[in-house]
C-alpha cells in the first residue's frame, strides 16, 4: 500500500526520533549535570539546528509534484482568439494545465 504522506514528512519523523535518541544517549552518558530539563533543551537544540531544512524539503517536494511553476502561465479558459485555427487547436501547455474543475463542467476546445 502506497503512503499518501510526502517523503519530506517521513524524513521529518525520522529526524525527530534521531534527535530524541541523541538526547537520551547524551543523558545516559552525562550524569553529573544538575539541569532537570537538559534532555529537552538538547532535543530542541538538535531539532532547531536543522528545522529550516524541512521547510525547504517540503517546498521542493511541492515544486516537483504539484506543478507550482504552472501558476506563472496565464490561462484564460474562454479566451477569444483572432484565429479559428488557434481556437480549435490550442497549445499543449494550455490543454495540459486546463483546470480540472473546469474540465468537468465547461466547454474545452480540445474535447470535440
Swiss-Prot record:
<keyword id="KW-0812">Transmembrane</keyword>
<protein>
    <recommendedName>
        <fullName>Putative uncharacterized protein YIL020C-A</fullName>
    </recommendedName>
</protein>
<feature type="transmembrane region" description="Helical; Name=2">
    <location>
        <begin position="36"/>
        <end position="58"/>
    </location>
</feature>
<keyword id="KW-1133">Transmembrane helix</keyword>
<dbReference type="GO" id="GO:0016020">
    <property type="term" value="C:membrane"/>
</dbReference>
<feature type="transmembrane region" description="Helical; Name=1">
    <location>
        <begin position="7"/>
        <end position="26"/>
    </location>
</feature>
<keyword id="KW-0472">Membrane</keyword>
Amino acid at each position: 500500500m502506497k503512503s499518501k504522506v510526502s517523503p519530506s514528512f517521513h524524513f521529518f519523523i525520522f529526524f525527530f526520533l534521531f534527535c530524541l535518541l541523541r538526547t537520551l544517549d547524551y543523558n545516559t552518558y552525562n550524569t553529573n549535570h544538575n539541569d532537570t530539563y537538559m534532555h529537552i533543551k538538547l532535543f530542541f537544540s538538535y531539532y532547531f539546528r536543522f528545522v529550516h531544512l524541512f521547510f525547504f524539503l517540503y517546498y521542493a517536494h511541492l515544486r516537483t509534484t504539484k506543478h507550482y511553476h504552472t501558476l506563472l502561465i496565464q490561462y484564460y479558459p474562454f479566451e477569444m482568439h483572432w484565429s479559428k485555427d488557434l481556437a480549435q487547436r490550442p497549445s499543449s501547455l494550455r490543454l495540459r494545465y486546463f483546470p480540472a474543475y473546469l474540465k468537468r463542467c465547461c466547454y474545452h476546445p480540445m474535447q470535440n
